[in-house]
Amino acid sequence: LLLLCTGCDNSPWNNPYPNQDSAKNIYYDSFSERPKHLDPVSSYSSNEYVFLGQIYEPPLQYHFFKRPYELIPLTATGLPKAEYFDKNGEVLEEDANPENIDRVKYKISIKPDILYQPHPAFAKNASGKYLYHDLNEKKLNNIHSLSDFDTVGTRKLLAKDYVYQIKRMVHPTVHSPIAGLMAKYILGLNEFGEELSKLEKDKSGSNYIDLNSVELPGARV
């Protein structure tokens, strides 16, 4: 009996990954369903949140090890500070009877000096004007990926960025599966959505709604 073995090594014969990457610090994972949305406002699948969790940082997160679960700050400087009000708008004590509480206001402060990942959208010229905010088909002729842009930039994360995302939940052209639920807890969210729908109907030739032009009582800076 003669057996001829060639190319024997310590790796599995059906390893789908390149051999030159075997010693690198790379984590491979799989998902059962292709992600449909990487927009946190529209996303509703755990398969999508595998990616979203590596892209976006919320103000709070759960402690990785503690059980029962415990919230800890992530981009926030600390846990939210709650202020309680009765139905007349009067401030209540911290130990007030829950039956007397009509609404709660949470104050969240965001850590300073958190920067966005460098991206062409933030790139500016010497005079401070954005380089790529007026792109047309001709300017995009030789652009196939983000790395094809010559310049990138960044900026600080601001509290108003989170407020903007909350507003997007009821944008007339964006579907958010949790908008109805959140409207029960965020003051004025339904009315805000109705106002955006009016702006959507009234706009002429533009597909852009300035969310900063409309105030949302339940989320302010």
Q: PLM ranges: what are they?
A:
Residues 23-34, 104-109, 162:
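Short, well-ordered beta-strand elements
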Residues 9-15:
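Bacterial lipoprotein signal-peptidase II cleavage site
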Residues 145-221:
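Surface-exposed binding/hinge segments that line
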Residues 4-7:
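C-terminal motif of bacterial Sec signal peptides marking the signal peptidase cleavage site
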Residues 22-26, 54-56, 74-76, 101-105, ...:
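Extracytoplasmic
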Residues 29-98:
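N-terminal lobe/hinge region of extracytoplasmic solute-binding protein
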Residues 78-178:
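Aromatic- and charge-enriched surface segment that lines or borders ligand/interaction sites
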